[in-house]
Design a protein with these regions (language model features):
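Conserved GTPase G-domain substructure that encodes guanine base recognition and part of the catalytic core
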Residues: 1-555
């Protein structure tokens, strides 16, 4: 049933107002109403779904458009979305009320977790809409807030969940970047926001990117030069200017009552009305253009997201494997040098003790951290941390598991998914010093090979063991390089956090801006830079660590 069906004498926006909730306290000159929304029972991690109205009786024949709205914290994204809803519902300058879809005032008072979800609003078409279609708005949390890079990475994971789920979003019409008009050059944070989002999309989405400029006036927005300079892939006009739409929502909730005293107030009202009219024209232009854009499937984007996540998991494990390989090589060299150094003593006494440095596996408690993990019970290694899957019965869905074979891509034994568990600890490695004797070493290898072992044979066995590990590392590196090359083929932009120079730029930006929590964010970025440097060498076919060069040469 259409609860908004209005009588001929009643405008559609008035009918919606009658069903809406007045927001209190009233913060501005006009009362503001939250439109009636129904929360949908769709379970996708990190996402919430709301609908306005009911689906058309025409079903799938009813035209529908989907937009995603993105922006850095403070770019004016929430106000812009509220401007859209007032336009769609037909609110006029002279009306004595306004609507809100996104209530920034309320969300700021709530815990971070309440404002951290990707929110999907489905506005079902009704007679009285100013647009001829149903509209889905994907509202993302603001990028670049005080919670830092880790929080921003969570947002991309939430979008990934939304695009990959059968109940989520499978196609898109416009990816809308909200940017402030006055930014002559993009800050490192702004550029990071653009590149982070672009990196999750397939190349076929480039034509659907639109720039929404906020706090605009009648002039050419300076931010367009910054967008051109930063290389954001988006459609451009004949003169090379990015396709954009200008908005100034300063008049959205402004006083529209006629001034009956000072002429100065009269001028101010005319000024506000001018901005309102400008906003209405911009909205009309934007939604007319939206109705002409070719809808794109998110199939390629899902492929980008899947391959990038698999690469991240592999890189984490690759670093561990290479370091373990290097530690094993050092252990072999140290053992050989000690045997040579004490050769005379060993000949007369096989129980002669010497110290050797090595890495030992240890369990690190993660209980209480809120993180899940995937550990291989057979190999006693951590295959994926943090993992988004808490239930062991669902571990086949972990990023470390090959979905075709059901076997782990990361652990040494390539074990079946059902021997992988969510546990209260992760496996790590610590440097220890152990006492060794040649007799013990020989006995261990004799037990393994069934052959009598000489000191020379012992050294060959140690070297052979290292060669096996080195070969495994090489295979991992080749797999990662293959994945990197595939991402270059299909992704719209590389992941900004995969480039050491880019991360260094972010670090310098954090230091200069010195916003609250900057030291913690810099610390996080330094760790990412180390990973990025590691991966850059892998991609070039170089030895990932400088120590590896020297150890390989000297052995």
């Amino acid at each position: 049933m259409n609860i908004f069906k209005s009588e001929s004498s009643k405008r559609f926006s008035d009918a919606v107002k009658a069903k809406s909730t007045l927001l209190e306290p009233q913060l501005g000159p006009l009362p503001v109403y939250r439109i009636p929304l129904k929360e949908e029972k769709i379970k996708i991690n990190g996402c919430r779904f709301f609908s306005f109205g009911e689906p058309s009786k025409f079903g799938s024949k009813q035209q529908s458009r989907t937009i995603m709205v993105l922006g850095a914290t403070g770019a004016g994204k929430s106000t812009l979305i509220n401007g859209m809803i007032n336009y769609i519902l037909g609110v006029k300058w002279g009306d004595t009320y306004r609507f809100k879809l996104v209530d920034e005032g309320q969300t700021k008072c709530q815990a971070h977790s309440q404002t951290s979800e990707v929110t999907v609003y489905k506005l079902f078409y009704r007679d009285g809409f100013e647009v001829p279609f149903s509209l889905t708005i994907i509202d993302t949390p603001g990028f670049g807030d005080t919670r830092g890079i880790e929080r921003d990475r969570e947002i991309t994971v939430q979008l990934q969940n939304l695009f990959a789920s059968k109940d989520g979003v499978s196609e898109i019409d416009a990816v809308c970047f909200v940017a402030q008009a006055a930014l002559a050059r993009l800050t490192s944070t702004q550029r990071y926001v653009f590149d982070s989002i672009l990196s999750i999309f397939g190349k076929d989405i480039a034509e659907n990117i639109r720039i929404l400029v906020t706090f605009a006036d009648g002039q050419k927005p300076p931010v367009l030069e910054g967008i051109i300079e930063s290389g954001v892939p988006c459609p451009k006009s004949k003169d090379g200017i990015p396709v954009h739409f200008k908005f100034n929502n300063s008049a959205l909730f402004a006083d529209n009552k006629s001034a009956d005293t000072q002429s100065g107030d009269d001028d101010e009202e005319n000024f506000d009305q001018m901005f309102w009219n400008m906003g209405t024209k911009s909205m009309k232009r934007f939604f007319t253009a939206l109705n002409q854009i070719e809808t794109k499937s998110l199939t390629l984007t899902n492929e980008v997201l899947r391959e990038r996540k698999q690469l991240e998991v592999s890189v984490e494990n690759l670093q561990v494997q290479v370091r373990l390989g290097l530690a094993k090589l050092e252990e072999i060299r140290e053992t050989r040098e000690k045997i040579k150094e004490h050769e005379a003593a060993i000949k007369t006494n096989e129980n002669f003790e010497f110290d050797v440095s090595l890495k030992k596996p240890v369990q690190v408690d993660i209980s209480g951290s809120g993180d899940y993990i995937t550990n291989c019970q057979q190999c006693q290694v951590t295959c994926h941390f943090p993992c988004g899957i808490p239930n062991d019965a669902n571990k086949r869905g972990c990023w470390a598991i090959d979905q075709n074979t059901g076997r782990c891509r990361e652990c040494k034994g390539k074990c079946n998914w059902n021997v992988h568990f969510n546990q209260r600890y992760r496996w790590d490695y610590k440097d220890v010093t152990e006492k060794r004797t040649v007799k013990e070493l020989k006995e261990n290898y004799e037990k393994a090979t069934g052959q009598k072992m000489t000191v020379e044979g012992l050294m060959r066995q140690l070297k052979g063991e290292y060669d096996i590990m080195q070969n495994e590392v090489k295979k991992l590196m080749e797999k990662s390089t293959k994945c990197l090359n595939r991402l270059k083929e299909i992704a719209l932009k590389p992941n900004p956090l995969s480039t050491p120079e880019y991360i260094e730029m972010l670090i310098e930006g954090e230091k200069q801006e010195a916003k609250p929590g900057w030291k913690k964010r810099v610390e996080s970025l330094m760790k990412m830079k180390e990973k990025a440097e590691f991966m850059a060498k892998v991609e070039k076919g170089e030895k990932p660590l400088s120590r590896q060069e020297s150890l390989d040469v000297k052995f």
